[in-house]
């Protein structure tokens, strides 16, 4: 009978062990390496940053443009158009008005025209003022945003202190009431307790 009872207990234990599933977790580094092999993009911020830089390198640079600055405010748009027309029709043009002067930007299909405009009008006097003409390389919008985010992140890191350091915490201020309570709650000496006990027994 004891043998049969042991067999019953053994069978029930075997059944419960077979029904109980043990979840085995793989190491985190192995799980992270499994994602790219299955076709999933890595979620690491550094990897995403590398992918973004790779895409920016693959994109062709924008065409160079000409910038004419320090133009007097009384110079009309028609005057500026007449100055540029002798070099051909620009495929892009934009004029900005500031408080002190004006700035215009032009883009031409032929990049060799830009050098000619610089030679012709850089330092040219227009309405008693010398204008400045230069060739510049425009940047894409996401490149400017990335540069702005990097500057912002750097400023935040400087505000937090040195790398690896903890945030500076302000010391906890204890009110005067709490200070008084702390003084009153100080442990009584052994002699004072004995004196109180003697007085209680005599009373």
From Swiss-Prot:
Q: Which Pfam families match?
A: FoP_duplication (PF13865), RRM_1 (PF00076)
> Which GO cellular component terms are attached?
nucleus
| Top-rank taxon, per record | Eukaryota
The listed locations are: Nucleus
Q: What is its main location?
A: nucleus
Annotated segments matching region Disordered:
1-60, 137-203
Q: Which GO terms describe its molecular function?
A: DNA binding; RNA binding
Q: Which GO terms describe its biological process?
A: poly(A)+ mRNA export from nucleus
Modified residues annotated as N-acetylmethionine in this record: 1
Q: What else is known?
A: Present with 1310 molecules/cell in log phase SD medium.
Q: How does it assemble?
A: Associates with mRNPs. Interacts with YRA1.
The role this protein plays is: Involved in export of poly(A) mRNAs from the nucleus. Recruited to the coding sequences as well as poly-A sites of active genes.
What this protein is called in its record is RNA annealing protein YRA2
Q: Which organism is it from?
A: Saccharomyces cerevisiae (strain ATCC 204508 / S288c) (Baker's yeast)
Give the organism's phylogenetic lineage: Eukaryota, Fungi, Dikarya, Ascomycota, Saccharomycotina
């Amino acid at each position: 009978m004891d043998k049969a009872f042991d067999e019953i207990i053994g069978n029930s234990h075997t059944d419960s062990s077979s029904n109980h599933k043990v979840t085995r977790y793989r190491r985190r580094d192995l799980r992270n390496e499994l994602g790219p092999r299955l076709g999933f993009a890595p979620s690491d911020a550094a990897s995403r940053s590398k992918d973004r830089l790779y895409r920016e390198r693959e994109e062709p640079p924008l065409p160079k443009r000409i910038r004419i600055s320090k133009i007097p405010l009384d110079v009309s748009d028609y005057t500026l158009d007449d100055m540029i027309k002798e070099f051909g029709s620009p495929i892009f043009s934009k004029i900005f008005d500031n408080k002190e002067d004006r700035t215009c930007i032009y883009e031409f299909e032929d990049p060799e025209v830009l050098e000619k405009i610089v030679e012709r009008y850089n330092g040219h006097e227009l309405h008693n003022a010398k204008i400045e003409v230069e060739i510049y390389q425009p940047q894409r919008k996401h490149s400017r945003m990335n540069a702005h985010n990097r500057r912002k992140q750097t400023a935040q890191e400087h505000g937090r202190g040195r790398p690896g350091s903890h945030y500076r915490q302000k010391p906890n201020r204890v009110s005067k009431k709490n200070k008084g309570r702390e003084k009153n709650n100080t442990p009584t000496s052994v002699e004072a307790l004995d004196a109180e006990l003697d007085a209680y027994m005599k009373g």
